[in-house]
Amino acid sequence: MNSKAFRPAIKVITVILVSHWAWKIVSGIPVCPEVYLKWQQITYFLCVILSQWTDIVLRAFTGVQFLQIENCFYFPGGYSVHISPGCIALKPIYHFVVLMIFGRKAIPGLRLIFLLIGVAVLVNFNILRISFLCIIMAVNPSLWFFFHTYFFRFAFYVIILLLWILWEES
C-alpha cells in the first residue's frame, strides 16, 4: 500500500484536530473585560443578523408560523429557538480558514478568492441550517436535539471536507 495516497487525509485530520485544540485553549484564556464586552457585542450583532436572514428564508420558503424577536424565534406550542454565539458558525469557518492556510501552495490572490467563496458557502449553509432547525422545532420538536447536536455538526465538516477536496483537486 502506498503511504503517499494517505498523506492528504492525514494532513486534513491533523490540521482539524490541532486547530480544534487550539480553539479550545484560546477560547479558555481569560481576557480583559473591555475585550470580552466588545466580543460579546460583536457576536450578539452577528446573532441578530443571522436571525434576520433566517427570518427572510422562513417567510419566503415555508408556511411555518413564528414570531421573531431579535435573535429568538417563537413557535406555537411554547417552543422557541434562540440564536446564540455558538450558532454563528465561527468554529467551522475557523477550521476552513486553517485548512486553506495549510492547503496546497497557490497564488495568494487565488487562495483568497477561494477562501471568500468557501466562507460564503459556510455562512449560507448556516442560514439554511438555522432555518431547517426552526422548521423542525415548529413541526416536530422531538427531532430538534438530534439535528442540532449531531446531524448539522457532521454536515458542516462534510462541507468543509468537500470544499477542501475541491481546492486540492483544482
Model-derived segments and their meaning:
Residues 1-170:
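Hydrophobic N-terminal alpha-helices or hydrophobic patches in metabolic proteins across all domains
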